[in-house]
């Protein structure tokens, strides 16, 4: 049966579903009808509750583990709860103070990012993650210097004053004026742009046939920018803190999942790709279980938010990873506040 939108559930079904999710997120254990019937907020018999829970199971919102008569939310159920029922409040004054204190210790920005990640890990009881900003410098000047009939030296000057020299192959018989034309075009037209922005503008200009240089110079411009983009230093760095939080008492019955998660955190590449995908949004993103396709863990969730530099561009992502039974209502605003605090620090 297709999972219905929250508005199509009856009031009784919504009440039972909310209580099951709340109890599961608190204890990590399946919830039985007798337990729910004892709650003062739910004036239903165990039999009535069982019928409602059966309906919710048929909708794909609840599941019954083989070892228990109780039920727990599925990944689809958690998604429905997070998107349609969760009530998010501001982080507590104590949480805010601890996050801000972690950022006030001074030192290099990487140290502040690591401290904020450790604080977030401690407050959330998850592993804290931060994607350190890519060093995406801006272009200032580019020159193409002939070296031989088949090679040219590309001199790349960045806005921060760093200079890089790269050698590229050129067609035999290339007119030297094409080298001058390509360098002048980049310095005059693309100066002040990041590499990504410069490459995008060149593509647009070529596709629209607005670029005011000949074909040979166009090829040099594209290849000169591509040489710079191949620099491995531009790859983001992932900092992980608090992996031990994933090995608490509640993980004893799920050691295979935890072991696999720790392996993923050790290699970092798939997690970094997942966090990098959160750069595209403007708000906190929640990836529940297997709905993220970048790594294979079905029992883990990631909450991540982008943070920005002085120019307003997204420069990195901060977040947490833990079991799907996270306290989403508390952790989502906590991650969001950390991202905002990092943005203020970097500016």
Curated annotation (Swiss-Prot):
The keyword Transcription regulation applies. Negative regulator of class I heat shock genes (grpE-dnaK-dnaJ and groELS operons). Prevents heat-shock induction of these operons. PANTHER family: HEAT-INDUCIBLE TRANSCRIPTION REPRESSOR HRCA. InterPro entries: GAF-like_dom_sf (IPR029016), HrcA (IPR002571), HrcA_C (IPR021153), WH-like_DNA-bd_sf (IPR036388), WH_DNA-bd_sf (IPR036390). This is Heat-inducible transcription repressor HrcA. Pfam families: HrcA. Keywords: Repressor, Stress response, Transcription, Transcription regulation. It comes from Sphingopyxis alaskensis (strain DSM 13593 / LMG 18877 / RB2256). Belongs to the HrcA family. The gene is hrcA. GO terms for biological process: negative regulation of DNA-templated transcription. One of its GO terms (molecular function) is DNA binding. The keyword Transcription regulation applies.
């Amino acid at each position: 049966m297709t999972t219905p939108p929250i508005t199509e559930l009856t009031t009784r079904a919504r009440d039972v579903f909310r209580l099951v999710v709340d109890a599961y997120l608190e204890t990590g254990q399946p919830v039985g009808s007798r337990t729910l019937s004892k709650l003062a907020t739910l004036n239903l018999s165990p039999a009535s509750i069982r019928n409602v829970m059966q309906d919710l199971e048929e909708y794909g919102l609840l599941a019954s583990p083989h070892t228990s008569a109780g039920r727990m939310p599925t990944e689809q159920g958690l998604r429905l709860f997070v998107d349609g029922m969760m009530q998010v409040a501001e982080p507590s004054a104590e949480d805010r103070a601890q996050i801000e204190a972690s950022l006030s210790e001074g030192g290099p920005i990487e140290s502040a990012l690591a401290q904020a990640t450790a604080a977030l890990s401690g407050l959330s009881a998850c592993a804290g993650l931060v994607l350190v900003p890519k060093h995406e410098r801006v272009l200032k000047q580019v020159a193409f210097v002939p070296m031989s009939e088949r090679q040219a030296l590309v001199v790349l000057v960045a806005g921060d004053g760093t200079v890089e020299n790269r050698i590229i192959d050129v067609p035999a018989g290339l007119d030297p004026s094409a080298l001058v034309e390509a360098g002048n075009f980049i310095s005059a037209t693309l100066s002040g742009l990041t590499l990504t922005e410069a490459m995008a503008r060149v593509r647009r200009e070529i596709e629209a046939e607005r670029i005011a240089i000949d074909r040979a110079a166009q090829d040099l411009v594209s290849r000169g920018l591509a040489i710079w983009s191949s620099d491995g230093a531009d790859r983001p760095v992932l900092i992980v803190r608090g992996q031990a939080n994933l090995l608490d008492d509640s993980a004893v019955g799920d050691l295979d999942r935890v072991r696999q998660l720790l392996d993923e955190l050790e290699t970092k590449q798939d997690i970094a790709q997942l966090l990098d995908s959160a750069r595209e949004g403007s708000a906190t993103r929640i990836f529940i279980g297997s709905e993220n396709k970048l790594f294979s863990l079905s029992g883990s969730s990631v909450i991540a938010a982008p943070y920005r530099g002085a120019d307003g561009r997204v420069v990195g992502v901060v977040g947490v990873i833990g079991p799907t039974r996270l306290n989403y209502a508390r952790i989502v605003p906590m991650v969001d506040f950390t991202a905002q605090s990092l943005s203020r620090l970097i500016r």
